[in-house]
UniProtKB/Swiss-Prot annotation:
Record protein name field: Small ribosomal subunit protein bS20
Keywords attached to this entry: Ribonucleoprotein, Ribosomal protein, RNA-binding, rRNA-binding
Gene Ontology terms: biological process: translation
Protein purpose: Binds directly to 16S ribosomal RNA.
Length: 99
């Protein structure tokens, strides 16, 4: 089966073993934050498509917090975070002006 990952060897040095333990925790935390980011962005996009400007602006404020957290932790580059916030901000503002 091609989908099975090859088993990794256990590190010999104590520092390597510690690093492996930390990697598991960090991977779980990063995956969780990345998922929270995707959900926040999707919720704002849905609100914009639905035309609900109050909900869109409320969700956008929460999304900004999530994006800033992810950029601060280095999961995404700060420029990507700024770009995503800018694009969604433009959509929310366009919705407010249209209505």
């Amino acid at each position: 089966m091609a989908s099975a990952k090859p088993k990794k060897k256990n590190p010999r040095l104590a520092s390597g073993r510690k690093r492996a333990r930390q990697d598991v925790k960090l991977n779980a935390a990063n995956t969780s934050l990345r998922s929270k980011y995707r959900t926040a962005v999707k919720n704002v996009e849905k609100a914009v498509l639905a035309g609900d400007k109050t909900k869109a602006s409320e969700l956008f404020a929460k999304m900004q917090s999530v994006v800033d957290t992810i950029a601060d932790k280095g999961i995404f580059h700060k420029n990507k975070a700024a770009r995503d916030k800018s694009r969604l901000s433009a959509k929310v503002k366009a919705l407010a002006l249209a209505a």
